[in-house]
């Protein structure tokens, strides 16, 4: 509801009325590719490979998004953009693997079949996440980010909430199972994170995808592991070793290539 309120305050009812069947279709597909199939596939991949490995593989999705943009949107992808995309992806994947090694996370104990299945699921996740960025680009043109996210979150909440309720009715929780909903004080602790990530972050994401070529916007939007490094260092949880520094340099070099392309 917050998205629609801000949309009406900033653009009136006309901003919401700009939704067309074309945009609704593409934005619905983006929900399927992200909150629907994409996140579900990632969950099952992480169960088989471990979260860091699954995330590293899924993080190649900017390559697919760049390909989609070049083939269907006529975006020009020169050598410098392609190099920048590959450097960003390589740097992010390297950082994720370094984080996994530092924490001792490994999927070696899993059977070979489970690891292969996890690999395929992680690759499918990368395609779904690329489909999300592509769908937002196709469906979000001409709309404000608040309208785009208002529709996406409303649809996702309705569908996922209904599925959860059906499952809850079929399989009621036992007396010793943890409750889904937290107390009011616990919920209030999440308010800053919700406003920062779900509202501000997702609005910036939509604006970037609809105002910049996918070959530039998608790699730059996928660099959260890079920004996690200084946070980890400041909190004293992660040392800055040579390998991590090299991974940062590779990622930043990719950013420079994309920005100056």
Report each predicted region and the residues it spans:
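Structural motif at transmembrane-helix junctions in multi-pass transporters
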Residues: 40-57, 141-147, 203-223
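Hydrophobic/aromatic residues within transmembrane alpha-helices
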Residues: 45, 71-77, 139, 148, ...
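Hydrophobic/small/kink-forming positions within alpha-helical transmembrane segments
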Residues: 4, 31-36, 62-67, 130, ...
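Juxtamembrane helix-loop-helix junctions in multi-pass membrane proteins
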Residues: 1, 13, 128-158, 215-216
